[in-house]
Amino acid sequence: MEHLLEVKNLSVSIDGPAGEVQAVRDVSFSLKKGEVLAIVGESGCGKSVLCKSIMKLLPPSAKIKEGSICVNGQDITCYREKEMQKLRGRVFSMIFQDPMISLNPTIKIGKQIGEAVVIHNKNYTKEQVNKKVLELMELVGISHPKERYHQYPWQFSGGMRQRCVMAIALAADPDILFADEPTTALDVTIQAQILDLLREIQMKLGTATILVSHDLGVVARVADRVAVMYAGKIVEIGTAEEVYYDPRHPYTWGLMRSLPAFANGKESLYTIPGMPPALIDPPKGDAFACRNEYALNIDYEEMPPMFKITDTHYAATWLLDPRAPQIKSPMGGTAHE
């Protein structure tokens, strides 16, 4: 299947008061039509910067240092703002974390969704715009769209506001939808509804989706593939089944053990010891080594390559090297198995 999106060896840096932060470091992945790829990791690992790099929504202090971004076979790495404006909305669109910040509280919902429709359909009549807005509201599950069309954001619940943001993002039928922590500001019940809606839209429209989250548990119900990020790098990537049921990287083990579902009620919830490294001056070897209870001597000296486990499953850990000792995984089995 042809890839909609291919990112190869992408590195992004951000100039800060203390120096240059290497926010994304040599990241490669691809996305197929209709696929849901979840990118998970701790706050600050580079998930959002990666997505904004692809859409060229980075602040002036950030720059792409190396690598390439191809969409539908076209290299867009060096595209200027005018060229990117033709892609945003139609080729890819984004749902941000906080719907209240994304919406204008002084403008009615129908008009805000309508603005997104008009930007990409300048020849639409008023009637066509209104019809499209109502269709989008129905698509994202907003009941009584004709009445709610005339309401303001403050008259909607948090979950309904997020649905409005989704309607805006879908206004031009994008090929790729970026969902940046879309459930963070919502309670657990509403989180499940929004995730189910994302999956429903993906199946109905064939929209490929990149779902960003810090919670492996959140993405379990919707992802086809999962990429685990740590300190600006993808350290493990595979199908959802492979990453959940056969994780190979010690960081992924830690994330899985941190899920409440793994607690037995008798022990305290597991936490990964230590803190992520400062990316102004990343460590020489494996960035996770100082927090990794299974670290080998080589982890402190040399960055591990991506080791192939299956045709779809890869992990960057020296534990997968044939010369490494057999380490018993806390999830069962060993890193080699």
Question: Which residues fall in each region the model found?
Answer:
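The feature captures the beta-strand-to-loop junction immediately N-terminal to the Walker
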Residues: V40-G41
